[in-house]
C-alpha cells in the first residue's frame, strides 16, 4: 500500500532561500521521471518569525509555487536556553547559525504523514534513482532513524539527509531530551546522535529511559556525499562510485550560491549553479538578477552580499500584477488523530477563492505553469 511521504526541508534563515528554492525545483524535475509508489508531498518547514517578518509577498509566492505545503513552526520549548547551553560547543564549529537547526526536532510531529524524508536546503539530489531511498527500509519503526555516516566522524550520522517515522510520543521524548542535554556539536547533529545512536550516549540509563530500541540505520554514503572534503575525500572512491552518487551535500560556510572563486569550481558546484539558472530562466526571473550573485553566477564578486528582496526586483517589471500579491494563510483541516499536531503548526495552503492574480492548484496545474503565471515574462 502506498505511503504518505513528506519530503521536507527547513528554512531558518533567508540566507538559505536560494538553496531551498533550487532544491524544490530539482526535486520536482526528478519526480516527473521517477517511478515512485508513494504519495509524495514537498514541504517547507519555516520558522514563524522568519516567515512573518523577513519575506516579501513575491518571495512567498515563489516559495508557494514550488512547495505543496508550507508548515509554519514555533520555537521549541526553552529553545533560547538550549541555544545558550550549547553555545560553547557550537563555537567550536564557528557556525552560530546552526543553533536554529534544533528545530528539526519538529519533524517527528508531522504525523499526517507515514514517513518523512528530510533534506537540508544545501543539498542537491542528482538523479531519479535518489528516490530509491524510500524503498530501502520498508519496515522502519519510529525508534529508528536512517542516515549516512558523517565523513568527519563515521561513528556519527550526518543530519543533512534523514529518513524517519513521525510519532508524537517520540517528538516529545526527543524535545525533552534536547532541553536536558548538551549537544556534542551544539546543534541538531550532535543531539540526534546522542538520542538515536548508542555509540554517542555513554549514559545508558538515560538512553534506556527513552527506549532500548533506539537505532541508527546506516544509509549508503552515496545518498549524502558531503563536499568540500579537504583532507577526507578519497579521489579513487569518488571516481569509482561517481555513477552511483545520488545526492551532494554542500557543507561548510560557503555555499554554491554564496561564493564564486576558482576554489569552488568543482563539477557539483557548477551543476548546482546550472540548476539555479534553469529555475530562474524557466520562471522568467533571469532579467531581474543580472547584478546579483543570487541569480547571476558569473558575477565578478567573490563573496555573497545580501540581495534586494524579490519584491524590489520584480517591481521593476512592467506587469502591474507583479506588484500586488494577496496571501491568505489558513489551516489545513486534519482528522482527529492529527489535532495535537495542528496546535503546534500552522499549515499554509491556497484559499478556495484567492484574491490575488495567481491561482495555485497543486493537483491539476503543473508547478512550472504556476510559477510562470506568478512571474510572467516581462514585456520587452
From Swiss-Prot:
General function of this protein: Self-glucosylating initiator of glycogen synthesis. It catalyzes the formation of a short alpha (1,4)-glucosyl chain covalently attached via a glucose 1-O-tyrosyl linkage to internal tyrosine residues and these chains act as primers for the elongation reaction catalyzed by glycogen synthase. Capable of transferring glucosyl residues to unbound acceptors such as free oligoglucans or oligoglucan derivatives.
Location of the region described as Disordered in the Swiss-Prot/TrEMBL record: 331-357
Binding residues annotated for UDP, in chain numbering: 10, 16, 95, 120-122, 249, 252, 255
InterPro entries in the cross-refs: Glyco_trans_8, GNT1/Glycosyltrans_8, Nucleotide-diphossugar_trans
Entry EC number(s): 2.4.1.186
GO biological process, one term: glycogen biosynthetic process
Protein's UniProt keywords contain Manganese: yes
Family statement: Belongs to the glycosyltransferase 8 family. Glycogenin subfamily.
Catalytic activity: L-tyrosyl-[glycogenin] + UDP-alpha-D-glucose = alpha-D-glucosyl-L-tyrosyl-[glycogenin] + UDP + H(+); [1,4-alpha-D-glucosyl](n)-L-tyrosyl-[glycogenin] + UDP-alpha-D-glucose = [1,4-alpha-D-glucosyl](n+1)-L-tyrosyl-[glycogenin] + UDP + H(+)
Oligomer and partners: Interacts with glycogen synthase GSY2.
Molecular function GO terms recorded: glycogenin glucosyltransferase activity; metal ion binding
Any single GO CC term annotated in Swiss-Prot or TrEMBL for this entry: cytoplasm
Principal localisation: cytoplasm
Taxonomic lineage from the root: Eukaryota, Fungi, Dikarya, Ascomycota, Saccharomycotina
Protein's UniProt keywords contain Manganese: yes
Annotated binding of Mn(2+), by residue: 120, 122, 249
Protein name: Glycogenin-2
Keywords: Cytoplasm, Glycogen biosynthesis, Glycoprotein, Manganese, Metal-binding, Transferase, Vacuole
Subcellular location: Cytoplasm; Vacuole
Binding site for UDP-alpha-D-glucose: 10, 16, 95, 104, 120-122, 158-159, 185, 188-189, 252, 255
Glycosylated residues, chain numbering: 230, 232, 367
Cofactor(s) needed by this chain: Mn(2+)
Record-marked site positions (Important for catalytic activity): 104
UniProt-listed Pfam families: Glyco_transf_8
Record field: compositional bias (Basic and acidic residues): 341-351
Amino acid at each position: 500500500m502506498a505511503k504518505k511521504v513528506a519530503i521536507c526541508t527547513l528554512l531558518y534563515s533567508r540566507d538559505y532561500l536560494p538553496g531551498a528554492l533550487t532544491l524544490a525545483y530539482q526535486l520536482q524535475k526528478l519526480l516527473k521521471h521517477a517511478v515512485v509508489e508513494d504519495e509524495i508531498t514537498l514541504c517547507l518547514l519555516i520558522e514563524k518569525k522568519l516567515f512573518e517578518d523577513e519575506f516579501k509577498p513575491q518571495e512567498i509566492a515563489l516559495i508557494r509555487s514550488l512547495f505543496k505545503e508550507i508548515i509554519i513552526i514555533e520555537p521549541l520549548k526553552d529553545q533560547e536556553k538550549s541555544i545558550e547551553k550549547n553555545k560553547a560547543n557550537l563555537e567550536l564549529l564557528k557556525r552560530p547559525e546552526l543553533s536554529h537547526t534544533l528545530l528539526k526536532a519538529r519533524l517527528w510531529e508531522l504525523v499526517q504523514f507515514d514517513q518523512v524524508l528530510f533534506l537540508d536546503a544545501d543539498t542537491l539530489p542528482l538523479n531519479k534513482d535518489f528516490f530509491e531511498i524510500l524503498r530501502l527500509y520498508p519496515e522502519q519503526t519510529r525508534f529508528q532513524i536512517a542516515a549516512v555516516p558523517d565523513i568527519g566522524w563515521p561513528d556519527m550520522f550526518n543530519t543533512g539527509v534523514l529518513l524517519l517515522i513521525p510519532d508524537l510520543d517520540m517528538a516529545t521524548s526527543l524535545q525533552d531530551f534536547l532541553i536536558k542535554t548538551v549537544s556534542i556539536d551544539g546543534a541538531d547533529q550532535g543531539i540526534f546522535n546522542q538520542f538515536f545512536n548508542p555509540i554517542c550516549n555513554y549514559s545508558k540509563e538515560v538512553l534506556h529511559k527513552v527506549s532500548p530500541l533506539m537505532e541508527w540505520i546506516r544509509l549508503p554514503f552515496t545518498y549524502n556525499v558531503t563536499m568540500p572534503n579537504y583532507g577526507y575525500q578519497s579521489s579513487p572512491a569518488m571516481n569509482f562510485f561517481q555513477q552511483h552518487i545520488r545526492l551532494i551535500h554542500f557543507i561548510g560556510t560557503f555555499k554554491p550560491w554564496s561564493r564564486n572563486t576558482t576554489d569552488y569550481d568543482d563539477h557539483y558546484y557548477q551543476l548546482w549553479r546550472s540548476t539555479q539558472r534553469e529555475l530562474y530562466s524557466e520562471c522568467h526571473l533571469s532579467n531581474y538578477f543580472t547584478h546579483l550573485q543570487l541569480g547571476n553566477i558569473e558575477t565578478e564578486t567573490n563573496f555573497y552580499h545580501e540581495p534586494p528582496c524579490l519584491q524590489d526586483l520584480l517591481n521593476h517589471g512592467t506587469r502591474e500584477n507583479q506588484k500586488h500579491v494577496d496571501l491568505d494563510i489558513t489551516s489545513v483541516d486534519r482528522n482527529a488523530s492529527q489535532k495535537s499536531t495542528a496546535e503546534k503548526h500552522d499549515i499554509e495552503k491556497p484559499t478556495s477563492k484567492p484574491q490575488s492574480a495567481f491561482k495555485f492548484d497543486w493537483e491539476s496545474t503543473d508547478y512550472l505553469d504556476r510559477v510562470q503565471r506568478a512571474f510572467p515574462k516581462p514585456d520587452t
